Structures are given as C-alpha cells and as structure tokens.
A protein has these predicted regions:
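Mobile genetic element proteins and their domesticated derivatives, centered on retroelements
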Residues: 1, 24-27, 41, 64, ...
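Short, basic/hydrophobic alpha-helical segments
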Residues: 1-23
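A structural preference for long, well-packed, hydrophobic secondary-structure segments
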Residues: 9-13, 54-60, 73-80
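Alpha-helical hydrophobic/aromatic positions enriched in membrane-embedded helices and signal peptides
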Residues: 19-20, 56, 116
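RNase H-like polynucleotidyl transferase catalytic core
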Residues: 25-28, 43-65
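C-terminal catalytic core of Y-nucleophile DNA break-rejoin enzymes
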Residues: 29-34
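Distinct, well-ordered alpha-helical segments
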Residues: 37-38
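C-terminal anion-handling pockets and recognition modules
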Residues: 66-170
Length: 170
C-alpha cells in the first residue's frame, strides 16, 4: 500500500480536488494494516495529501471492488486453463492478473464508485439497486470517465445525515 497505492494516488489525484480528504477503504482481513499504522501515517504525511485509512463495514459486498467483478473475471479466465495442481492455479491467477486489461478494471472501479454514491444517497442503507451506466457503450464512444465524482448535494446530504454538517465549512 505504501509503495504502490500512495504514489499512484498522489500522481493521479485531480488538482481541482486538492485539499479534499481521500479515504482508502480496506476489508477487515488480517493481512491489512490498521488505520493508525505508524509507517502508513508517515508515508501519508510525505504525500502532502489528506489520506485516511478506514475499514469496510461488515456485510457490505457492494463496497468490495473485488466482489463487483474482478474475481469473477479472473475466475472465468483461469477456468480456461484447467489447472491440475494448486501451483498451476496460482500461476494462472498471477499470469491473468498481470495481463488483466486496465479498461476492465476501470469498469469495476466505476461500479464501486457508483455504489458508494448510492449508499450515500440512501443514508448508508443498502436498499438500492446497483447502478448500471452502460460502461461498455460509453467506452466505445470514448466517453467513459476515468472516475466518478460524488455530486455536492449528495455529499452535503450525507454529512447532514451524519449530523456533522455544522462542523464542515462548505
């Protein structure tokens, strides 16, 4: 995370969003680091960005980009290999992930971002339909955005729902 993710965020973060808090959400698996990990905190300070590490809420698969399509896509690619041993399967997954096309991963990340907006729109509840944006068609037209932004009114409403609107300067 420190060697790859933070530099990637720093290099690609839009200038017009400077000063905005960036939240990195990870699931609760044991290999992940804690939000107050000292090495992570120092590395974030070096970026000059406001980056915070948070844990994925329990039972929220829509917030797991891997569950939104990446694993299924890798599985369908590796199923074609018919591995006979565990080592063959691991090698196949590693090969496929290294050769995984960026545009496919972008589609997964856009779905994740759209789910995040919907969760904010529904005051944190999960009673929404996963939005479909015709990503393939937009991609073919050269109109697929590299990222989604949260509409200001959705963000403000989410802050209001959390009862912290008064503490945030707009």
């Amino acid at each position: 995370m420190i060697e790859n993710l933070l530099p990637a965020i720093q290099a690609s973060w839009p200038e017009n969003d400077a000063g905005q808090t960036i939240y990195i959400q990870q699931d609760n698996a044991k290999p992940h680091i804690l939000p107050n990990d000292s090495e992570f905190v120092v590395a974030v300070e070096r970026t000059g960005l406001d980056i915070r590490l948070i844990q994925q809420p329990a039972n929220s698969p829509d917030l797991n980009g891997l569950d939104l399509g990446f694993f299924n896509s890798l599985q369908s690619l590796t199923d074609c290999l018919s591995p006979r041993m565990l080592q063959d399967l691991i090698k196949g997954v590693l090969d496929e992930s290294e050769n995984y096309e960026v545009y496919k991963l972008n589609r997964v990340l856009l779905s994740l971002q759209a789910c995040m907006v919907e969760i904010l729109n529904h005051a944190g509840a999960n009673g929404y339909k996963i939005p479909h944006a015709n990503k393939e068609r937009l991609e073919n037209l050269g109109m697929l955005p590299p990222r989604l932004t949260c509409p200001p009114e959705v963000y403000a409403n989410a802050l209001h729902n959390l009862g912290i609107m008064e503490r945030v300067a707009c």
